Amino acid sequence: MDSTPRHPVVLAVRNVRKYFPIRGGLFSSHVGDVRAVDGVSLDVRESETVGLVGESGCGKTTLGRVILRLVEPTSGHTYYRPTPEVMGRLDSLYASLGDDNGSAHKPTATSSAALKELDEIAAQYSLYRRNQRKMRELRGRLQIVFQDPFSSLSPRMLVREVVGEPLEIHHTGTRRERDQRVLELLQQVGLNPEHLWRFPHEFSGGQRQRIGIARALALRPEMIVLDEPTSALDVSVQAQILNILKRLQDEQGLAYLFISHHLSVVRAMSRRVVVMYLGKVVETAPTDGLFSRPLHPYTQALLSAIPIPDPTTKRERIVLSGDVPSPAAPPPGCRFHTRCPAVMPICSKVEPEMTAMGLDHYVACHLYSSPEKAAPKGAAGALAMAEEAPRAVS
C-alpha cells in the first residue's frame, strides 16, 4: 500500500483479521463473532511514525496487539523485515487474490499457485509462523507502551526491577551491566538515579509513563507500538512525553505505530495516517495530504471536529447521525453507510475497495470508485472538502 521509496519496511501488515467468538445457549455453542479487526493492511517503516486514528471501539488497540502477536490473529499476516522485492511480490499476490485471499469454494489454478507462494513467504517472514523461541528473540525488537501508566507497572516492583526485567528475561549482560543500562534508560526519559529505588505508586502519571517508555527501550527495539500514550495525562505532561518520543526517534531511528483519538497530536507526530472505522481501514495518506484534503466522509467528519485556536475562524462541523453499529453485526456493504451524509444506493450493497487517489493516498469509498456518484442533497456539507479531489489513479 505504501509505494513511495523511503526507509526499509519494519512490519508489513497484510489482511489481518481478529474475530472474537460469541458463545451462547445451553452448550455455549458458537453463535457469532465480534469482528474487531477485519482485513487491515498497513506498513511501518524505519524512523517513521504511522498514526492510527478512529473512534473508540473501531479496533485500533486490538490491531496494535495483534500486530505484535500479543493477541493471536484469526487470519492474515504481519511480515517482519520483508525485502523490497518481497514487498512487491506480496502486493501483487494479494491483489490477484482479491479480498477473499483465494478462499473461494472452487479455487482456480492461479489462486492455488498464489496461495502456495504466499505460504512460502509467510514461512520465512511472518511473525505468526514463528515458534515461541523465535518470537522471544523478536520481542526485544518490537515493543509496546500501554495507554494506562497506572496499571501497566507492577506495584510490587521497584523502578530498577521494572525497567531491568526485560534485560533479565533475555539474559542481557552481567548484573552490573544491566544496572548501568537501567540508569542510562532513566536518564534518557528524564528521570533521576534516586528514582531507581522507588515504587510506581510514588510517581505521577507522567513519570509512570516515562518509566513505561524506559522499559520499552531496554532491549533497543526497532519499533514501538504507542497505544494512546498520552490520553491519560494532563495537557502539559502530554507535551513533555511527546517531546521525549520525538527526541528518542531522532536519536535511535525508532519506528512508531502511534494509536490515538487525539487528531492534533497525531498530526504533530505522524508522517502517515491510517483511519479506521468499525474494524476496517477507510483512508490512508501522508499526514499533510490527509489533513489538507480528506476524502472519505468519515475522515472529513473527524477532522471537522478539531477545534481551531482562533475565535475569528469558523469551520462547518459535520455531525454524524446515528450510533456506531455493533462489530458483532456490521452492516452490509460499506460499514459507514448507516451514518454517511453522502450515502448512495450502492453503499449498502457493495463493500468499497481501496482506490488510489494520488501519491500514497488511498480511500475506500464509492464516491471515488463507483459510476453512481449522484449524492443526496444532504451530502453537500460532507463533500465540500472533497470536491477538488483528484481522479482515481488507475
Predicted regions and their residues:
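Short catalytic/signature loops enriched in Gly
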Residues: 2-9, 22-28, 33, 110-114, ...
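Conserved ABC transporter NBD signature motif
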Residues: 76-88, 95, 110-126
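Conserved ABC ATPase signature
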Residues: 199-203, 207
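P-loop NTP-binding/switch modules centered on Walker-like glycine-rich loops
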Residues: 55, 65, 69-73, 223-233, ...
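Conserved ABC ATPase "signature" region
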Residues: 176-194
